[in-house]
Amino acid sequence: MHLWFTEKQNDNFAISYRVNETLHTETTPFQHLAVLDTVPFGRTLVLDGIVQTSVVDEYVYHEMITHVPLNTHPDPRRVLIVGGGDGGTLREVTKHPSVEKATLVEIDERVIAASKKYLPELACGFDSPKAEVVIGDGIKYVAEHKKTFDLVIVDSTDPIGPAVGLFSLEFYRSIYEALKDEGLFVAQTESPYFNTDLILRIYRDIAGIFPLARTYWACIPTYPGAMWSFTIGSKKHDPAQVAPEKIREHATRYYTPEIHRASFAMPRFLADRFR
């Protein structure tokens, strides 16, 4: 008999993965944490029953949440990552030569520990001399730092449990205050197929605070619907108007200058909702 893990998206839809082995499981002070070795996607991080990342397709998410905003800013030096305890976002941020310091604030240190042990391909980001790790509340940390960062990346779990406040209007206002005059921020904003209303709410909240708001997307097989959105709030620079020659090349597997531009092209079913 085979072992299966099932992630329930709603009452009518679920995704199941055949599992080779349960590598790790624990209940932390904040959430249930598991690392599974799945047949289709290899080692997979699961928090509160929801797949966060896998070693097979993690590069898509981590490249798109980082390189799009980093290549939008003309000279990003200070970067804040809220969440991102697996280390993948930190790994990509530190590839940029202009970045002098990347601070990662993670509320659950057990996520970092498990990632270092079972997901070293991602957690190698913690080894960068540019990296600073703070164990604590990202909302509080942002509120305590005014005009400090060129880029804030909200690499959060879904809007449940400890991550609920990371999707709030008050938090977006706090991020605006934490950014320098040319700063911008990006957040993962869920599935266009299953969370359209949430995406629209987040977009409108951000557009009410920042001069520029843009939503873009990427194909990520392990996420529900395999299509995932990200939303940017920018004080000055438009991520959808970055000239190809301005996009800095890095060792990537998904992100390219062409993908950067194409990611802002909305399918009609989604574009119609933004009108």
UniProtKB/Swiss-Prot annotation:
Question: Binding residues for S-methyl-5'-thioadenosine, per the UniProt record?
Answer: 31, 106, 137-138, 162
Where would you find this protein in the cell? Cytoplasm
Q: Where is the PABS domain?
A: 2-235
Protein's job = Catalyzes the irreversible transfer of a propylamine group from the amino donor S-adenosylmethioninamine (decarboxy-AdoMet) to putrescine (1,4-diaminobutane) to yield spermidine.
Active site residues according to the UniProt entry: 155 (proton acceptor)
- A Pfam family: Spermine_synt_N
Question: Pathway listed for it?
Answer: Amine and polyamine biosynthesis; spermidine biosynthesis; spermidine from putrescine: step 1/1
Q: Which GO terms describe its molecular function?
A: spermidine synthase activity
Q: Which InterPro entries match?
A: PABS (IPR030374), PABS_CS (IPR030373), SAM-dependent_MTases_sf (IPR029063), Spermi_synthase (IPR001045), Spermidine_synt_N (IPR035246), Spermidine_synt_N_sf (IPR037163)
- What is one cellular component GO term in this UniProt entry? cytosol
In the record, the note on similarity to other proteins reads: Belongs to the spermidine/spermine synthase family.
UniProt EC number:
2.5.1.16
Which PANTHER family does the annotation name?
Answer: SPERMIDINE SYNTHASE, SPERMIDINE/SPERMINE SYNTHASE
Q: Which CDD domains match?
A: AdoMet_MTases
* Substrates-to-products reaction catalysed: S-adenosyl 3-(methylsulfanyl)propylamine + putrescine = S-methyl-5'-thioadenosine + spermidine + H(+)
Quaternary form? Homodimer or homotetramer.
Q: Coiled-coil region(s) at which residues? A: none
Q: Which residues bind spermidine?
A: 62, 86, 155-158
Q: What class of enzyme is it?
A: transferase
Annotated protein name in UniProt: Polyamine aminopropyltransferase
Keywords associated with the record? Cytoplasm, Polyamine biosynthesis, Spermidine biosynthesis, Transferase
Q: Which GO terms describe its biological process?
A: spermidine biosynthetic process
